[in-house]
Amino acid sequence: MEFPKPRQFRETSLLMYYLDVVFPLQYISPNNNCLGKREWLLTILTSARPTYYATLCLALLYKESLSTSCRSEQTLVWKREKTYYYILALQESQKLLGGLNKTFGITRLKGTVVALACMLQLIGFESSHLSRGDWRVHLLAANTLIPVLAEGWSTALQSGPPATSIWCELDESDFDSIDDQTSLSFEYLGALRFLSNSLAKIGILSCISVGPAAPFEDYGHLLDQPGLIQLEEVLGCKNWAMLTILEVGKLDRWKRQEQEHNRLSLKTLAMRAMIIEDMLTDELQKLPTSETLPDLITHIYAASIATYLHTVVSGLNPNLSEVQDSVCATILLLERLPDLQAVASVTWPLAVTGCMASESHKDFFRSTLRSYEATFSSLKKYDGVLEVLEDAWKKREVDTESPMRWEDLMDHHGLPVLLF
């Protein structure tokens, strides 16, 4: 009888650790009914080397974070193994991405899904406060996959309507097409939906950190795919609010382009901003009176988007009455969150609102973020958000003359913070 080699045993253990511990922290869902419906996940994580290695890398990153200072030898082992798998993941991901253009049809679509899984794992690794790397290169690579993802989803819809939720379960009908090589299996289709939603979430929320260079239209194209993107299920925020973030980002890009050519019309700027503000108002009026957690989270996003919009129009000036009005409105909504765990879904609103907070409101953000950090473990940048806020407040005090932009505030030691 032949047994696997010791390293294979270790890798299997790390993979189980990722599934049991890291994945729930990486993809915290505000809807507990969705938890556990990830039957497609193991297939995708083990289907190609780059995704597999990137997953092991994430597992080791989290193990390293839990090591105490008195166990330095253990920390060194986690760090050594993490670096080993990180290098392998980078090498294999380049091979995978480079080979996609040489494939066609269902093979290319499957390869694209696996490549997206790898890119998202690498983004998760680099953007974590535990590593603080440059996640932008991996997001850029993931964005190039959007056309194939959209085409694949369109093809999948021809076989019938999709499941109502992105958190779907294996059905008896899936066994009828087990040998079908012309369409996506349950596992690949489930991964395509979930990973596309994750890309949309990360991509849209990254726009404020990336600035006008962000591919707003690409993320809008993802949102336009019928039934594909349901951000309420991965973030707790409805699609329309995320679409509005893109619209504000595009307005910011347009304004800067017009300023560069000395042709900015304040009248046109005000009109375009009013259209976006009316969009927010109209959608908020449609929210039901019996508020659910996703409704509250969406309302929080809408209020903070108003702050974002005001600063794009008038500059990053916390002293403006309209800015403070939206900041106060957002804080009142944040105070209605049922528990600290819900903070996981509102990192972006906390950062945007906090950057423009008045002196009297700073302690609210400090206590909220510190309480979350002390209560929950996460791979996300919650401590990074507080550092961003503290830096933003200092910049406001020190430099009141130079015009500040959002990507300047989101910069932390030369690298942008990813708010997701």
Swiss-Prot record:
Alphabetized, the UniProt keywords read: Nucleus
> Single GO molecular-function term?
DNA-binding transcription factor activity
Record's GO cellular component, any one? nucleus
Query: Any idea where this protein resides?
Result: Nucleus
What GO terms describe the biological role, i.e. biological process, of this protein? positive regulation of transcription by RNA polymerase II
Q: Which domain of life is it from?
A: Eukaryota
Keyword Nucleus applies: yes
**InterPro entries of this UniProt entry?**
Fun_TF
**Any idea what job this protein has?**
Transcriptional activator of all of the trichothecene biosynthesis genes. Acts upstream of the cluster-encoded transcription factor TRI6 and is necessary for full expression of both the other trichothecene genes and the genes for the primary metabolic pathway that precedes the trichothecene biosynthetic pathway.
**Which protein family is named in the record?**
Belongs to the TRI10 transcription regulator family.
Question: What protein am I looking at?
Answer: Trichothecene biosynthesis transcription regulator TRI10
